[in-house]
UniProtKB/Swiss-Prot annotation:
One Gene Ontology molecular-function label: carbon-nitrogen ligase activity, with glutamine as amido-N-donor
Family statement drawn from the similarity comment of this UniProt entry: Belongs to the AIM41 family.
Alphabetical keyword list: Mitochondrion, Transit peptide
Transit peptide as recorded in UniProt: 1-24
Protein name stated in the entry: Altered inheritance of mitochondria protein 41, mitochondrial
GO cellular component, one term: mitochondrion
InterPro entries named in the record: Asn/Gln_tRNA_amidoTrase-B-like, YqeY/Aim41, YqeY/Aim41_N
Major subcellular site: mitochondrion
Amino acid sequence: MLTRRITLGISRNLSRGALINARFASSQSYLDSVANLKKDLKKAMIAKDDLRKTTIRGLLSGIKNKEIDAQGKDLDEFALHDLYSKLITQRKDSIEEFLKNNRSDLVEREESEIEIIKNYLGQLPVASEAEIDAKVSNLLTELKQSNPSLQLKDAFKKVDWKAAPSDWRASASMIKASIVRQFKTKS
């Protein structure tokens, strides 16, 4: 029994150390965004703004879960962008359900939370969906001029995926989704 407790204690300490290292390997804008959230949480607590406080706590909880899931991988502003976008989508789905059930009080709360999350989403140094779509559209136009029978897989091969985050200011998943969307509309 004693060895079991010791083993559990050691493994618990090791996992905490891994989380600390993961946070230090993250990008500076990621760290700044998390620090900004914590600062805003403190302000919301002092101002007794329950809606903002609850929303920011939800964001920090989602970030913490993302860090745990990453297990030592670098996290950056694109991971935050994906998380915030996912949370906005969840709230939009909730609004639809609340409207079906005539819960206007909950609809207003969800809409307010969406505005708060969009505020933090706008602070991230990430290209907007419209900017990404414009770059992808230009890329596909150039590729189709040189090769009229362009396939989707060929378009994916032409993107420098290692340089894409810095050049495009977008994550690979955002660029891939835009390529698929644009390719379907141009075909």
